[in-house]
Each structure stands twice: as C-alpha cells, then as structure tokens.
Amino acid sequence: MGDPDLLEVLAEEGEKVNKHIDYSFQMSEQSLSSRETSFLINEETMPAKRFNLFLRRRLMFQKNQQSKDSIFFRDGIRQIDFVLSYVDDVKKDAELKAERRKEFETNLRKTGLELEIEDKRDSEDGRTYFVKIHAPWEVLVTYAEVLGIKMPIKESDIPRPKHTPISYVLGPVRLPLSVKYPHPEYFTAQFSRHRQELFLIEDQATFFPSSSRNRIVYYILSRCPFGIEDGKKRFGIERLLNSNTYSSAYPLHDGQYWKPSEPPNPTNERYTLHQNWARFSYFYKEQPLDLIKNYYGEKIGIYFVFLGFYTEMLFFAAVVGLACFIYGLLSMEHNTSSTEICDPEIGGQMIMCPLCDQVCDYWRLNSTCLASKFSHLFDNESTVFFAIFMGIWVTLFLEFWKQRQARLEYEWDLVDFEEEQQQLQLRPEFEAMCKHRKLNAVTKEMEPYMPLYTRIPWYFLSGATVTLWMSLVVTSMVAVIVYRLSVFATFASFMESDASLKQVKSFLTPQITTSLTGSCLNFIVILILNFFYEKISAWITKMEIPRTYQEYESSLTLKMFLFQFVNFYSSCFYVAFFKGKFVGYPGKYTYLFNEWRSEECDPGGCLIELTTQLTIIMTGKQIFGNIKEAIYPLALNWWRRRKARTNSEKLYSRWEQDHDLESFGPLGLFYEYLETVTQFGFVTLFVASFPLAPLLALINNIVEIRVDAWKLTTQYRRTVASKAHSIGVWQDILYGMAVLSVATNAFIVAFTSDIIPRLVYYYAYSTNATQPMTGYVNNSLSVFLIADFPNHTAPSEKRDFITCRYRDYRYPPDDENKYFHNMQFWHVLAAKMTFIIVMEHVVFLVKFLLAWMIPDVPKDVVERIKREKLMTIKILHDFELNKLKENLGINSNEFAKHVMIEENKAQLAKSTL
C-alpha cells in the first residue's frame, strides 16, 4: 500500500466511483469467483473499501475482455480441465439438487480442485450455470501416481522404423512427420510425485497433456461424495447426471476446429486433426494415430487403428474379388450354359413347367437368357477360388491384427495395462438396488452385494425378451417370404399378359422382380426392428442390474450382436440354404402353410438371388448408416445454435460452444464397433456369392473413417480420455464369425451355386470330348408329363405339348421309378458333401498353420520392449543411487570407496565362515 503509483491510481479510482460505491460493490461481488474474492482485504475503512472495489473492477474488466475462445479461468493462467453445467431449476426437488451441488463442489475443493462458476446471466439461454474446474499441479501429480500414468523420463534411443522402398511409393498417402509423430519417443515410467526430478518436467503447465488432465479430473469427479441419502454415502458425477442435478459434464476442446489457437491458448490439436484427418479431401491419407490417441485417449484411438487396419486389409480382398468379377464378365458371352439357354434351337425349344399354380403359364427357357448371363458373373469357376481365398484372408487379417495390436501396446505404453478403474467401478444403479454388503477379497473393504437369487428373475425376463425379439425377426422374415410367394404369381401373370412389358421381360423376370421387391421390403423391416430393439436391449440390460460399467457393456454387446446377427443375416441364410431346396416337383409341390407354393430357383441357380439380397441389405445399411451418422448430430447442433446462426464465436464462450455440441455418450464406440462387425459378417459369411462385397466395404470404410473423424472433431463434445489395449469382446466375435464363414461359404459353393453339378457333369456324364459342357442344360432339367398335373395346379389354358421341364435330377415319366431322384442326383449330393469336407479341412489346416507361423508379437517389438524395460530399470537405479549419494553427503569417489570397503568386509566375513 506504500507504492506511490498505486496510491495515485487508487485516488483516481476513488473519485470516479465514490457516488456509486455501494451499488458497484454489490454488482461486482455477484460476478466474482470465491478465489477472486480471496484477494480482497478487510473493509473497515473507506480507502480499503475503495481498494477492494478497484480490484473487483479490474477483475471484471479482465472477465469482459477475455476472449470468448479462451480455455482458461478469468485470470488467464489456470487452464480449464473440465466443465459441469446445470440449469436453474424451479421444480419441487430443486432444493435437494442445490444441496447436492453445494456439497459436491465443496468436496471437490477439498480434494484440491479449483472451481470458477459462470452465472446464468452470462449464458446464451439465461438459464444455464457453468462450473469450470482446474486441477493444480499438486492434484495432478498425486492422482497421476494413483492412476499409474506413465510419463517420459528420457528420450528414446530406439530409432523409428526405417524407410523402405515401398515407403517412397506410398509417399502421397503419408502425412508430414510433425503430424504423424507430434512428440518425440521417450522411455517412460509410472509417475511418482516423490521422484519428480526423474521426469522430464520442463513446464508444469504443459507436462501433463490435456487428455491426462481430463482423465484425472474425471477420476476425482467419479469418486467425490455429495452426501448421505437413505443411510448410504452417495458419490460420483454419473449419479448426479442421472438425477439431473447436473445436466452435463465434459472436458473442453482445444479451440475452434477451423482455425489455430491464438496465445495464450496452447497448441490447438483439434485444428490439426481437422486439417489432416477429418476432411474428406484427405480420404487417401493415412491417419494421424498418435495425435488421435493424444487428444481422445487410447480407447478411441484403438478403434480408428482397427478400422484403418481392417480397411487396408480389405484392399487385397477387394482386388482379388474384382479380378474374379472381371473374369466372370469376360467369360459371360462364352459360357456354354448361357449360350445353350439363349440359343433359340436349344433354350427356345425347352418348355418349362409353370412357376405357380393355375394362373402361371408355361414358358420357354430362353426367356431367362439375360438372367443366366448375369448369374454367370458371380457363379463361375472363380467362385471356388474366391471362397477358399477369403477363408485364408480372414485368418491373415486376424493374425496380423494381433501383431498390430501388440505393436500398438508397445508404442502407446500399454504393455502393463490394467483395466480402467472407471470401467470396474460399481454402477450407481447397482448400488441403489443392493441391500446386502460383503467383504471384497481384494480390497478388504465392505461393498454392495446382490445375491444371485434376486437377479435370476431379471435374467429370465432378459432371456425371454431377447428370444421374443429374435422370434419376431424370424416371423418378419416368414412374412416377407409369404409376400414373395403371394406376389410372384401376380408378377408372373401380369408380365405375361401385359404386352408393354415385352421389352423388359428378358432381364426383368418374375423371379428377379420378386427378389428385388422382397429384398427392399426386407431391408425396411430390418431397419424398423433394429430401431426398436436398440431401445429394448438397453432397457432389459439395465433391468439385469449389471455390477460394473464393463459388465453392462459386455451384456449389451451380446444382446445387440445376437439380434443384429439374426436381423441382418436371416434373410441371406434363407436364400442361401433353404430357398429352392425343398420345392418338390410338378404334381407334388411342397406348400407353406398348405397355401403358398415354395419358391423355386432360377434355372441358372439361386446364387444370383443371394447376390441381390446381399447387395441391397449391405449397401443400403452402409448408405443409411453414413447418412444418419452425418446428419443426426449436425441437425441437433444446428437446433441448439439456432439463436446464434451468425458469428457464433462472438456470442458463445468456449465452454458454451462445447455444451451445445452433441454428447458422444458412453456407448458411442459400442455402436461404431457393432456397425463394423456387422459389415465384417457380410464380407465373410456370404462372400462366395458376391465377390464385390469387399470392394463395397472398402469404399464404405474409406468414407466411414472420415465421417467418424469429422463428427468427433466438429459435431461432438470432447470425450473423456480412456485407456484400452484391445478391441475387447469384439475380437472374440470376429474369431467366431471367421470360423463360421468357412462353413457358410463351403455350403454356398456346394448347395447354392451351380459349380458342383457342372463339375460332376464335366467329369462323369459328358459325352462330348471336345466340348465337355455341351448338353449340360438339357441334362440338368428333368421331364414331367403334363397329364400328371393335379387339376388344382395345372394352368387353366390347354397346350398342344405333352411334357414340360423342371430343375431337378429325377427319372422321366416313362421310367418305372418315375419322378424319383435318379443316380446323378446322389452323385451330385455326394460330390457336394465331399467338397464341403475337403474345403473346410483345407482351409482350417491353412488357418492353423498360418496362426502357428505368425507370432502374436513381432520379434522387433519383443526386442524393443526388452530394451525399454532395461533402460527404465537402469535410469531408475541411477536416480536412486544418486539420491542416496546426496543423502549420505559424499561425492562419487568417496561413495565408490565406501562401497568397495563394504564389499571387502562382506567377502572377508564369508571366507571366515
């Protein structure tokens, strides 16, 4: 107070505000934080009162002049690590919520966190309070040790992977090294506040990255108590969010995604991510994985690593699949079967039996000429090769992913990973329902416990609900089948009688028309059922009262995957393994519910229909999913910002801008994995019928990566950084689907495609040595005597021919075993079963050999891990040794001499014994 300059300023300020001092005092105090008011002095005298007012006015001036994009407290020094928000509530439980918040925030301050509250009058809606949280150095170092966060102790001497010749070829897809490797490589060790000198601490404000800071704060928030209710201690931000005591809790983004930060804000990694990752013009570039991990945490980072690796592996499958498709395209015009079907002298002379009862007429085989050519695109010799190739590809994918995962564990310091504490934390819903407690064998503390007998009813309810919804899926599939059966006759009679459709009959047959409309209808039903089941599955999982967040996610994963499996794949299984297999024959057809005649396959086979079904469902799901992922958060955020459509940067503070973004939610990654694994099923389970499936998946994933990056960077709040060392239970699901895919593709080749019957004819029944496939079409069609039609199935119009043909291997009407399966049928069946056994054994043998030959952890990674452990131990040893020297107060020579004396004494004592 003795500084003359300061006294002069005080005098000037006092003259200006003397008349309004009381009013200014009241207004300024309402807008200052508790920490700011702590700078004030005792106001017993007028000069002191004026001095306090001066400080308040200066603090208010700083507040008003603070950049709206600032991520600091009003002092411009303390960084905001987390934000809580709540709405001014006038409901009857408002007082209870206010008491909870007061107790919670008081306890947060007791842990060492610093809080600053933004009044609702400063918010855009005039209703929302914001609580800004800062973790000071002492809090960070304490909880970094508790969480076992690894921090750098020395720059690594292990060189990064060297450039290979292929690296120069891939130059255009590479990112700048400053983006790909934003930080140098370090040897790391678990942080210890008692060994701070060991760590490379250049600046305390930037030593802990923002992801580690928000992880530490969230750890405190999730354990901070807020009172005792019903005789139980209540704690955790999640419980307060569930009760709407707080409306949201989130860490701040670094800044705007469309421009770099201005001082004093730190480097804007969000902007860097948007520029180099979240733009669609960078679709061909690699991902900045280290930067993603640094900003969002390992759990989100590993999802993008997996999606990127899966996409890279799809490239090889897509190339082979495209080659198989091109082979089918080039050989389409030279295919003997299609040539015979299209030949007026062969296919044009073959009268086929009606495809439905009474209303359908006889038809000539060459009317399916174009359809048979299309069928050859996917049903040719390359189908067998591609089915075997994909069985091997999926093994290579999973084995190389294990290697990639092991390398990732080393690069991201996850070698000694332990499950995230918050994932193992008890759910508030579980605690609320528990009436018993028992001793935890590990922690030796009493914890809530729910006996099994109290949960059994909920398990039964859960199982019954899942079974009911799966039954509903099957019922909907049967309904679509009934639709196909009922409209097939309508399409057939309509297309036969309408002369205007003559031009399209060659490629739009009743079978294809029914298949297209049925597949589209099935896709719509799938989306509707999926929408409702997502809500139902979340509800029944909550009813099971899972103990931890990890148990909740695992239970939900199982339910959702089982439903998705049945919902998306059931129609494909029907077309692949049931359609056309139990038709019967003319005069003795099989009927669904004794009313609708079973569907038949096209003379060219059922594979083209499976291809159609797979294409519509897979492509439709991917397009719909990407549109929904992009538009949904965009629309919600626009609605929240509708009051500030222009120049929102000036209207909103940084915390309010982030508050108005959509929350990614605790299950955000769950749905991303579910979508990817469902696509993986389409690519592997039925790929023999559609070699272009990997190409479609590749294109979708290239878009998916950028859509996910864009929405995370621009449309969602920043997520709390979480650790994960693998993709979790999804890896087991992928392994299960990989094994199942070998069987499904073997059965598709054997029973759905026409490859095996052709091979049997080629080697056993062909009589033409120069062109062995000549006569195959005639051989594959059996003969039926029209007079044998029952009255209720025969066409209403009489014809002058006496026989018709149908697809099967049966004796002709003039044989003593008429209409029974002939010997060729059994030969073909034996060949099909043999093929399945041989293919499965060959593929599984190759799979096991590859799994044995490819190590789970690459050799160079093993060496790097050993090197880092050795160097870490050495650095820790040297640190402790130097510390011991300092404590003993002796120099290095004296210390060495002291050690030698002690060693000599020990040897002497040993020799005397």
From Swiss-Prot:
In the record, the effect of W655C is given as:
In MMD3; uncertain significance
Q: What is the effect of changing E202K?
A: In LGMDR12; uncertain significance
Substituting N265S results in: In LGMDR12; uncertain significance
According to the UniProt record, what happens if one changes M900L? In LGMDR12; uncertain significance
Stated name of the protein:
Anoctamin-5
Q: Which domain of life is it from?
A: Eukaryota
Q: Which gene encodes it?
A: ANO5
According to the record, mutating V87I results in:
In LGMDR12; uncertain significance
Query: Per its UniProt record, what InterPro entries does this chain match?
Result: Anoct_dimer (IPR032394), Anoctamin (IPR007632), Anoctamin_TM (IPR049452)
Query: Could you say what the effect of mutating R404L is?
Result: In LGMDR12; uncertain significance
Note the topology in the membrane.
Multi-pass membrane protein
Keyword match Zinc-finger: no
Keyword Glycoprotein tagged: yes
UniProt record similarity statement: Belongs to the anoctamin family.
The UniProt-reported impact of D93E is: In LGMDR12; uncertain significance
Q: PANTHER family under this entry?
A: ANOCTAMIN (PTHR12308), ANOCTAMIN-5 (PTHR12308:SF23)
Keyword tags: Cell membrane, Disease variant, Endoplasmic reticulum, Glycoprotein, Limb-girdle muscular dystrophy, Membrane, Osteogenesis imperfecta, Transmembrane, Transmembrane helix
Q: Name one GO biological process term.
A: chloride transmembrane transport
Q: Any further remarks?
A: The term 'anoctamin' was coined because these channels are anion selective and have eight (OCT) transmembrane segments. There is some dissatisfaction in the field with the Ano nomenclature because it is not certain that all the members of this family are anion channels or have the 8-transmembrane topology.
Impact noted for substituting M839R: In LGMDR12; uncertain significance
The UniProt-reported impact of K259N is: In LGMDR12; uncertain significance
- TM ranges are 300-320, 381-401, 463-483, 512-532, 558-578, 680-700, 733-753, 835-855
